[in-house]
């Protein structure tokens, strides 16, 4: 967990399918706006992560590239290590490898992969993370990643089991701040009090590693003042009680002018330790103004 006043990093996860030319344009635009990381999601119907990352590297000069995040049970760990190491070679060491346990049952069924219990999927993630660490630590391993220890591991999660795995293996821990309802309903946001409790639990798990691990928060939306009323109408019934009348305080939303949003992010870095902030593609442009203020 990086120091509360650590330097910000900003990422954007690109979700919309695109032609080659459009993909190149979007990646270059992200770099122009000041983003540090371009992320590629791992859902059926979207571009395959590793080819998309390699093209993103060819189209840009400095941004790092991440899977944000893989459905880890889709992948054999040894073959995933080869994919990640090759991508790291071909991007000159710009890859970060994001891992998640997977949560969309329909995608598993479509792919013909058993949708195991949550506990089993977390075990699969833990085994994969340990295998990646072991292989990349072997000086004889080929293909050799450019980064000496291999691509940094980003592990996403919120629950106790996933955070225990992340505390053991991750260089970056990504927290969602919101999750889809199990019945397919609107996002269920997490308030400040619940986030405080998660951070306390995570600090305990990390122990001496706390200052070395970077914390990421995924912002579900960046909402300018003129869209506040519509956003409240959409999200209001599903907000936690401690911020029901103050949605600006939700860790997974940004609401206000660019200056107000910048201040909110500084406050969250101070309170929770979130120094790495990711937005979805739909928020890429408005977030650019906030990034400029925080450089």
What do the predicted segments below correspond to?
Residues 1-295:
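Active-site-adjacent structural elements that line small-molecule/cofactor binding pockets in enzymes
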């Amino acid at each position: 967990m990086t120091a509360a006043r650590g330097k910000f990093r900003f990422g954007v996860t690109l979700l919309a399918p695109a032609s080659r030319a459009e993909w190149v344009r979007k990646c270059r635009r992200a770099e122009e706006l000041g983003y540090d990381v371009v992320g590629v999601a791992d859902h059926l119907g979207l571009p395959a992560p590793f080819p998309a990352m390699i093209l993103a590297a060819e189209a840009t000069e400095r941004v790092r590239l991440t899977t944000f995040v893989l459905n880890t049970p889709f992948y054999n760990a040894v073959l995933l290590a080869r994919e990640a190491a090759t991508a790291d070679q071909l991007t000159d060491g710009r890859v970060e490898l994001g891992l998640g346990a997977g949560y969309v049952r329909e995608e598993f069924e479509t792919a013909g992969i058993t949708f195991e219990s949550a506990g089993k999927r977390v075990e699969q993630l833990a085994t994969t993370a340990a295998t990646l660490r072991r292989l990349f630590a072997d000086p004889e391993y080929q293909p050799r990643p450019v980064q000496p220890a291999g691509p940094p591991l980003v592990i996403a999660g919120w629950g106790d089991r996933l955070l225990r795995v992340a505390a053991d293996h991750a260089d970056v821990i990504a927290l969602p701040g919101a999750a889809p309802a199990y019945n397919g309903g609107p996002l269920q946001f997490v308030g400040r009090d619940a986030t405080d409790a998660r951070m306390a639990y995570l600090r305990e798990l990390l122990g001496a590693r706390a200052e070395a691990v970077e914390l990421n928060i995924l912002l579900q939306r960046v909402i300018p003042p003129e869209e506040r009323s519509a956003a409240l109408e959409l999200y209001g019934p599903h907000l936690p009680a401690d911020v029901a009348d103050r949605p600006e305080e939700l860790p997974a939303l940004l609401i206000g002018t660019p200056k107000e949003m910048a201040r909110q992010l500084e406050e969250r870095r101070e309170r929770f330790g979130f120094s790495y902030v990711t937005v979805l593609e739909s928020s890429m442009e408005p977030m650019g103004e906030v990034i400029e203020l925080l450089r």
